Amino acid sequence: MSQANDSILVTPGSGATVATELINGKEYQAVVLADNQGQIHGSLESYYYATPTVAVGASKLYLDIFNATGSGKIMDIRGIWIIPATDVALTGALGVRYDLYRTSAIGTGGTAAAYKSATPDVAGGNINPVDTNNANLPAGITARWLPTGGATIAQWLFATYAPGEETATSMAHITQYQNIVPVLTVGQKLTIRENSGILVKQGTVAATGNTKFLVIFTLE
């Protein structure tokens, strides 16, 4: 990761050298963007967590991601995308409600995520670094598909709905990769500090359909 490492006084004839770019005969100052923690935009090590497909179900626990004490990392959730399956001949009558929670304990049961697997839809889902030069995940950062226990809910954050229809002409086709945390891209990041995590859980109303998820997160 990179952080801004200097500041300069913009005083003609003194100070550090400022990078510029010549455009149409004029020099324009070249800049890089930094966030509120001094991280250079685009420099944080990023990872994907892609899950298998599963049939939806009332109150189903889909996935939890946990950042255990001692990981030495702060996790920022950049997006959680719902991906309804459109290659199954099934028509859903109801939309599916997905709730996002903060958790205070790691999930149990289910299947732990694989790391850099070459198998599509591997059991437990698969975590991949965006850049192969990224460091391996700390042992304290884990993901679990279909946990059956643990994942103690500490806070309800919000809910969203996605269609359950699975034909190519349905709303499920139109809303592929629906991000359920878009409002957080304009303010603070959805930050997961040590000894906390997130959980995606279906609402109490039964529905039909099959779905998977894609989570993108960064570490700092």
What residue spans do the PLM features occupy?
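Beta-sandwich interaction modules
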Residues: A168-N195
